[in-house]
């Protein structure tokens, strides 16, 4: 963030996923999470947020898709969920050939429970059941993908990403087919990987 060689005023930033029904200033909002850690710390040209409170969610998906088309993504920084999701592309809704760039998805129970386990929500009942997400093809349009995956609870998903079948059953497995894709692990998340 503090690298003086980067002219942040030339960069349009996007976030990849957002809960439906969560206020943008709520601590659980991914837009809020990114804003306080990154977006407020450097002078981006523009920061674009998904609106999980939009009255018409299909229009919101189209608005965001139009922005992504107007400002093609160069770099995606992402993680992997316990179920192998990238953004909110859980196994049941992931589609490697999705015709959409942004869509409404139903979150699977493993994804929702992860949010409780990580103390984002106190109980499963408080975790939204739906979210907005960039689709897998939208993510793969980026020139570069940097996937950062810490913590032991992600070790199985990392194993499936690296060694399992490339399929929507582990959405992150598609990263193996993406040129210019890098996976960064800590010792705990990498415990099942032969290095």
Question: For each predicted feature, which ranges?
Answer:
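A short secondary-structure junction signal
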Residues: 59-62, 87-92, 97-98, 157-161
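Short, flexible loop segments at the rims of nucleotide/cofactor-binding pockets, characterized by
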Residues: 53-56, 122-128, 161-162
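A glycine- and small-aliphatic-rich helix-loop capping segment at beta-alpha/alpha-beta transitions
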Residues: 1-7, 30-35, 91-101, 166
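ATP/nucleoside-binding phosphotransfer catalytic cores, i.e., glycine-rich phosphate-binding loops
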Residues: 134-137, 141-195
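Ligand-binding beta-strand-loop-alpha-helix segment within the catalytic cores
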Residues: 6-77
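Glycine-rich phosphate-binding loop
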Residues: 71-96
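Solvent-exposed alpha-helices and their adjacent loops that cap or buttress functional pockets
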Residues: 5-7, 41, 67-71, 95, ...
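Class I SAM-dependent methyltransferase SAM-binding "motif I" and its flanking Rossmann-like core
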Residues: 87-134
């Amino acid at each position: 963030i503090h690298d003086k060689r980067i002219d942040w005023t030339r960069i349009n930033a996007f976030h990849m996923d957002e809960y439906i029904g969560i206020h943008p200033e709520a601590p659980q909002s991914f837009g809020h999470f990114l804003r306080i850690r990154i977006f407020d710390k450097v002078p981006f040209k523009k920061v674009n947020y998904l609106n999980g409170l939009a009255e018409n969610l299909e229009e919101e998906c189209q608005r965001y898709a139009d922005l992504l088309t107007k400002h093609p993504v160069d770099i995606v920084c992402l993680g992997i969920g316990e179920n192998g999701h990238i953004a909110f592309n859980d196994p049941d809704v992931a589609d490697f050939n999705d015709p959409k760039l942004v869509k409404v998805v139903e979150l699977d129970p493993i994804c929702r429970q992860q949010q409780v386990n990580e103390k984002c929500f106190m109980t499963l009942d408080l975790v939204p059941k739906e979210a907005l997400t960039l689709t897998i093809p939208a993510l793969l349009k980026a020139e570069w993908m940097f996937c950062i995956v810490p913590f032991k609870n992600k070790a199985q998903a990392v194993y499936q990403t690296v060694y399992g079948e490339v399929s929507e059953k582990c959405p992150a497995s598609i990263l193996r087919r993406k040129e210019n894709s890098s996976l960064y692990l800590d010792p705990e998340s990498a415990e099942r990987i032969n290095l």
